[in-house]
């Protein structure tokens, strides 16, 4: 110990440990032995124990984890965490143009959108981990959240504090040989990926083996499971790592002009970024970068499942904007899925929630793409015929998109004499109803409708899923029990369940039953968009349900709409419109809807854009920046959208108004630069009231 007072010594120790931590986990160039780091760490621990008032949120001692949580709190992302669209390459195509046709189409769309002959792209590895958001205020990590559904994630701040490569405090870092120093912004939101290095994954599985516990299938599953531990001490023991790949917000500073320079800027703040990055020009540069990254894949210390390309200039990104839930300026180029040989032991069919009959190959277990595969989809009867798959065949199995296993092809020369062809059954294997196939459809369907328990189960699972009514605690196994016990036949039956009936189910118990009843009661209050999505109408996904709710405003208006009226809604074509008309034309479906409403399912009134439009707001694009005196950001956004306006996250020539509050940052500067009208809160409220 030194003669310094405890406050000064603690501050000095924290600064030293932050520096040594950055050298070890980010720069991979430690300047002191592990024993010296451990000695200083123990000294700081002892100081904070003796003087609790010295403990701080950015102390390295916070990395060891704290007391377990009861549950994770929800976090609404100020800017949605969007996913990327994917492109694939057919590496079996000998023609280079055909091999990368999807990538070429992406490049063409970007060039067309920008009016350029050639575009500069930033290239990065596509990490195979878990997307997270980090928020720093005045350099201190104050919040960490998972991506969740893109709009709402889970608050995993305490767990992320245990990840050694994540700085708890940003510094005006001096930089290193590769990266320049940077200035800490007042508020910074960084997006990145939490993952587990291959060596740490092997170590974890060795520990699982020694403890007699189940092994993790792959590093991604291990990372996701580790980050979502309610006990942060478990997360701390798992040796996760982090790489930043985007800036969502940076208040009080001007970002560099390009994405690649922005990544260098983050590195200057002490945040870890990938060193497998490059900048290329045009399609030839993209394909070359892809081939190079594919060749590096096996030798990298972490798993990647593709390459990410982003238009490098941020001004060009802003011009291209977004479509649905993905940016137009970026794409993920997925690697070819891993393949393996195995034998088809049987071909059965499974029944989907809409009655779709899907042939499934039952396989001799085979390890593909990090998991053991025993089943593979054959899609439909025509696909089985086209690939000529027989029971007994040796086949090549691939994890398409590294997610869904599929049979790619048959090694016909290995077909045994006793191999037998697949015959589509005439009746549903679950309920015995006839299987029918329309002349213009590839998919056969069970005609049993809601009489078929397989459809009951999958329809109920969809109804209760996170993006639908989000019934906490109602998973696949419990749905199976409820249907098999005859307690639930339609979604409306869920709301008639009581605690005594549920408690009698296997492995439920009084507390679990009480929690489910409470969760169901909470789900009675939802939104029209979620309700429409929960009905499971064919071809109506989450985004379409949201568009329908905004366009029609009420369920009655939606149910009464004919095909032509439906096609006036955004992104609704004839196929989707036909599905909606057919769904509500079925009397049983209307009975289910009526029963749900009678059970108390309700939502706030949704005002349509046309009915709520305010002159001066409707059709205009707004950007919010800084802190408004009385309106929260979500409240301001909701009021603008209710009046027919649109709120975006970045300022461009298409922006009509920038609403600026206290501590407005670079967005305000950009507005002045482009000559865009700037409003304060009072002016915004006047505009919304139609008084401007």
UniProtKB/Swiss-Prot annotation:
The active site is at residue 126. Keywords: DNA damage, DNA repair, DNA replication, Ligase, Magnesium, Manganese, Metal-binding, NAD, Zinc. InterPro entries: BRCT_dom, BRCT_dom_sf, DisA/LigA_HHH, DNA_ligase, DNA_ligase_AS, DNA_ligase_CS, DNAligase_adenylation, DNAligase_N. It is an enzyme of class 6 (ligase). One of its GO terms (biological process) is DNA replication. Residues 612-692 form the BRCT domain. SMART domains: BRCT (SM00292), HhH1 (SM00278), LIGANc (SM00532). One of its GO terms (molecular function) is metal ion binding. Zn(2+) binds at residues 428, 431, 446, 452. Its EC number is 6.5.1.2. GO terms for cellular component: cytosol. Gene3D superfamilies: 5' to 3' exonuclease, C-terminal subdomain, 6.20.10.30, BRCT domain, DNA ligase/mRNA capping enzyme, Helix hairpin bin, Nucleic acid-binding proteins. Its cofactor is Mg(2+); Mn(2+). NAD(+) binds at residues 34-38, 83-84, 124, 147, 193, 310, 334. It catalyses: NAD(+) + (deoxyribonucleotide)n-3'-hydroxyl + 5'-phospho-(deoxyribonucleotide)m = (deoxyribonucleotide)n+m + AMP + beta-nicotinamide D-nucleotide. Belongs to the NAD-dependent DNA ligase family. LigA subfamily. HAMAP family: DNA_ligase_A. DNA ligase that catalyzes the formation of phosphodiester linkages between 5'-phosphoryl and 3'-hydroxyl groups in double-stranded DNA using NAD as a coenzyme and as the energy source for the reaction. It is essential for DNA replication and repair of damaged DNA. This is DNA ligase.
